Amino acid sequence: MGAREILEVSKPRIVLLLVITAVTTMYAGDALSAGEPGPDLWDYAHLMAAGALASAGSSALNHYYDRDIDPKMRRTARRPIPSGRIGENIVLAYGLAISSAAVVYAYFLLNAPTAFFIALGIFSYVIIYTAWLKRTNRSNIVIGGIAGSAASWAGWTAATGTLDLLGFLIGFLVFVWTPSHFWCLAMKIREDYEAAGVPMLPVVIGMQRTSKYILGNTLLLLPYSLALYAFGMGLVYLVIAVASGGLMLVYHYKLTKTPTPDFAWKAYKVTAPYLTIIFAAVALDAAFHYPFPFPF
């Protein structure tokens, strides 16, 4: 056991994605609201620290809970617990400690609403998704997507102290995006989930129908993302949302024609950066905020 194993159970790429989501939303919340004074650099640092602790702790608890099924899946069989590189009780203690620390840290150094949404993210990922829905319901990832939304809502409330309609809608975008993203991955590794007895959508309804669900979800995601203009976003956001969402739509349409693991992986690689791009667009739009020149 060492730092490498602790880093691995923390899932640093997911930590980075959620911290980017929270920080860009914090910036947008500050820029688009009339509240004064806004957050300073220390507030951003505190949000990054609390978000990283929460995400890493949740990931560690996910590793702990899934220790019985990870050996059955090629993708996860070499994780630290099933490979014997770290003790399961160490991972449990680490996950509980830093998850709890994240909520306390946010409460005292940011504000109560931010601490609440960080706690919501931890609870929805660890309890609702990992411990309950993942092994029992084919819609598991749909409901579990609320964990990603919570990161955005935490960022907004860290800036404003409250969650208004625009802040809620921006965060809910993560929830809408999650099925399109994760079902592509599930199509790629369907055999793993089947071997582990996890009822992911491709296991339950097959590859062809899952590809149609992905396309249907993306057909909801694209207009939803564009509709945010009507609630306060501007031209910079709109242009980037059209381009990135349009590319996803093309690949997900092609996936319905070629519902194979290999093409699902290509679609996944297009879908994966969407969230980072769209939240960068939120931040850029907040910085420049050019209103769209046509009345809606």
From Swiss-Prot:
Keywords carried by this UniProt record: Cell membrane, Heme biosynthesis, Membrane, Transferase, Transmembrane, Transmembrane helix
Transmembrane segments: 14-34, 41-61, 86-106, 108-128, 141-161, 165-185, 230-250, 274-294
Main location: membrane
UniProt-annotated location(s): Cell membrane
Highest taxon above the source species: Archaea
PROSITE patterns membership: UBIA
Family label: Belongs to the UbiA prenyltransferase family. Protoheme IX farnesyltransferase subfamily.
Name of the protein described by the UniProt record: Protoheme IX farnesyltransferase 1
Upper taxonomic lineage: Archaea, Nitrososphaerota, Candidatus Cenarchaeales, Candidatus Cenarchaeaceae, Candidatus Cenarchaeum
